[in-house]
Structure formats: structure tokens, C-alpha cells
Amino acid sequence: MEVNYRWKKHYKTAKYPIRQPKWLTWLIWFLSKCALIGKKYKLETIDMEGLEPPYIIFSNHMAFIDFELSAMVTYPKRVNNVVNIDGYHMMPWLLTWIGSICTRKFTNDIHLVKSIRRVVQNGDILCLYPEARYTPIGTTSFLPDSLGRLVKMNKVPLVVVTHHGNYLYSPFWAYKNKRKVPMHTVFRQVLTAQQVQEMTVDQINAAIRSAMEYDEYRYQLENNIRITEPNRAEGLQKVLYQCPHCGTEFQMATSGAEIFCNHCGKRWYMEENGQLRAIDGETEFPHIPDWFEWEREQVRQQILAGEYCYEDEVDIYSFPRCYRFIPLGRAKVRHSFDGGFTIDGHYRGEYYHIHRPPKSLNSLHVEYDFHRFRKENCFDVSTETDSFYCYPTNPDIITKLAFATEEIYKLHLPTKVKV
């Protein structure tokens, strides 16, 4: 049951992208070059010699600077990027003009597949960020099996772009605090067109997952990258929300280069090389992603024990069109193993109900200090025609909700394809 808006028209994502004018590729390159002035970066290509479009790019995603670095390598070729609808906020004409393909995150967007096919038929480059979010902790996020089928059906080469240092430069949980970090972008042809034709979908998926594996904190340690900013740990509690010493959730806080638990008092210091060290006692997780994955396992165990269920009354802002977020007021949100996500509320005197079954949602779009309008943590539950940005009572819960969404989805998969 949809929201009772004054108008019934939603932004149409089911339309084909335009083909970039050649001169526009130069403008994008020039603006990207200007944006990178003063930043230290390296661009590298591997097995790309002689490769001409059409081909598909899969890229990891860390910060907006990913687009600028990629544009430096793809120039002067035409590129169509897949972009979530919030990127169209206030300027859908501009995103359409540069050839972007609009979608809503984690929805069953059939027309997106058709648009990708059109780009390939045009003889151009299709760039997709299959993790569909900025990496929360600098490691590979969930990659769906549908990626292999997408590559197989288009029968063109696959290039994987791996950005290193971009997360360290601007971590998602503290994106406003830029650091002085060298960046390294690698374009690698992972599969030729012939290999795509000869390999099975499972083999293609295995190649994709292998090529897209990364760990920014390991990269920092191995390359002796020192982050000396005194506030380098501030914001880390948004992703490291559970204390590994006492097990308490949502009592973590940060100050300067330290993260600490307000419940038991234990403190950890973030070294300049990105490793953690306990101020007193045992260091449970020197490697930050290990702490993150430990939290994920705690959520999974809650789900398996039947103890997980999230219910809250949240503030909701919807985004049916591209020019403004619409305040819908308070609504009840529920997330459970059997029911997935449900949103129940009233708008303009009428009841609305939104439901995303657990099998239909392989991950959750979360935002830390969402920059579009209300600068707080939120999560977004989208349908094919609308997006609902939910501001929970406890803003620190969104990382746990993302874990729960992914683990519930995995547990609903047939045993043979669980990841």
C-alpha cells in the first residue's frame, strides 16, 4: 500500500541512458584532473593493452574520489555509470546529461539490466559499483551471485578497478575529515570476452570475488602508510559499536585517536599505521576489520538463536522524485528473520504499508551523517518506485541493521549457494 502523495508521479528510473557526447568525456576528465590537484595518486593498468570498448567495469567503492580517479583512466572513452537515485538530488538533468543510469539500491530493477545491455550495444563502457555503497570498514562488502549472470549475458570483457587508499583518505564513518594519504587505482582486465563465453556463471563469480578482494588496513600496514592526524579515530564508533571486552552494544565513543567503552571503561589507541592497541590489558582485535567481522558474527548468532528482532518508531523522509525529500512523520519499522522489513505509517490521513521480504533484500543502504539534508545516521529501505530514509531512535544501530539484513538474506538462500 503506497504513500498517499498529492501527486502520483514518481521519478522514472526505467529509461535508457543517453550516450555521452565525445566532448563531454574531455570535460569530465578536465574537471576530475582539477579536483585531484594537490592529491598524491598513482594510476596503473594491467592486461589492458589493446582493450577497446565495449566492456564492463566493476569497481570497489570508498569515496566520491573514486569517480574522479576512474575518469582519468577511461578518458577519452564514453562511460555510463550506474548511480543511486540520491545522487540525482536536485540535479537529475545533470546526471542524465552525463549518461548516468539511475536505480534504487537493493531493488529488483529489471530495466537496469536492459540499460546495461544498451550501453554494451552502443559500444561503450559500463561502470558498476557492485557493493552498492561506500565500504564501511575498508574491506569487500557483499557481492551478489547475479553479477556473474550479468557478465555472462553481455559477453564482453570484464575489468575490475581496485582503489587503494581512498578509504583511508576519506573513511565513510568520518568522510568530512580528509587525511593526507597516497591513493593507488588499478585497472585490471580480469576476463576476456572469450573467457566469459567459455566459463560458467559460478566460475565468473569466483573470478569476480577474487579480483575484488581488498583490505585497506592491511594495505596501510604493508605499505607503511602513516596517518598522523590527531583525530584519526573520531567516528569509528559508528562501525565498531559493540565492546569486545564487556559485550555491551552502543556504548562506544571516540576522542582524538582513541576509541573507548562508556560501560566498562576499556580504551584502545589507533596507531598511525591503522592498528589498534589496548591502553590496558589484552588487545582483542589489533586489526580493525576483525572487530567489525566479530560484530557481524554476534548478530548472526542472535538470528540463529531466534533472539533478533528490531522494532522502532522512526522519522521517515521519502524520495519518490529527485527534487526534495518529503517528511512523512513518524512510522513503525520492524525487521525480523521471517518478515524482513516492514514500515507502517500514515500520511495525509491515509495508512501506508511498505514490505521488503528477507529474500528480496541482500543488503541495507545506510548513511553516516547523511549529507543531503538531515545530518544524522539513517538507513534507507527502497522499493522499485520510492525510497524511505529512516532516522532511528538510536542512531548507532544502523551498522547492526546492515549486518542483520545481510545475514538474514544469506540464511534464506539455498544451502548450496550460501556465502
Report the location of each language-model feature:
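Short, surface-exposed beta-strand/loop "edge" segments at domain boundaries and coil↔beta transitions
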Residues: 267, 324-326, 344-353, 384-392, ...
